[in-house]
Amino acid sequence: MNVDDDFEYYVINLDRSKKRWQRINKHLQSMSIEAQRVSAVYGADLPDDEIARYYTPYLNQKQFFMPLKPAEIGCFMSHRKVLKSFVDLSDKAYAVILEDDVEFIGDVLEYQQQWLDAVQGEEPVMLKLFSRRQVHGQVVYTHQGRSTIRPHLVPLGTQGAVLNRSAAYQLLNTLSQFGMPVDVAYQHWWQHGVRVLVTVGNHINEISAQLGGSNISNKQNLPLTYKIKRESKRSWFRLKIKLISMFYYMKS
């Protein structure tokens, strides 16, 4: 079976980051993968009326502990753009969505059965391919020593994921407007209705540091008191999400 038979590969990449696209495209082509490049949305360049179509202060106050940065808004809109491209333009069953600062660990062919075990079927499912920390949860699939778990808490980050068409439609419909970062939104599976699974052992490496770090963030020199207040809010928010997630996990 050709690696492209079931999966459509997408790479989110800023227009100005040509070298990143060239690097990851070469990496993927070495495994006979022809990926679709999706031009990332650069939040700092968005007009206010375009932002207001998707990001609202009302939702932000309800959903998150601080206003989103332009980079976070652009990131969310970029991921929506990929999902829209998949459902509108692809006839394949599954999408593999990658950011441009990753690379696969080993050959993709080694992972495909694990992906299929997770996302095939009518239920909307997303399989995350990377986590910075160990993830705890229930093992739902095991194939040739590779396990997939349903996590107690969905890990942050959107470095790479596989999802089926049902999941793409579900996320587009339920996250048409937002007030929190896209990876935080994905943590709220009890709201968007997509089953989120995670591979035990990463399938990709994050190599942002080797490429010069993030190319979308605008670092600012902020007062120490502001930083302390922000981190205090962040800690409380993360604890709240962890507790709520465990509550719904135990109910399901």
Please give the residue ranges for each predicted region.
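An acidic/histidine-cluster motif and surrounding catalytic segment
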Residues: 1-98, 102-252
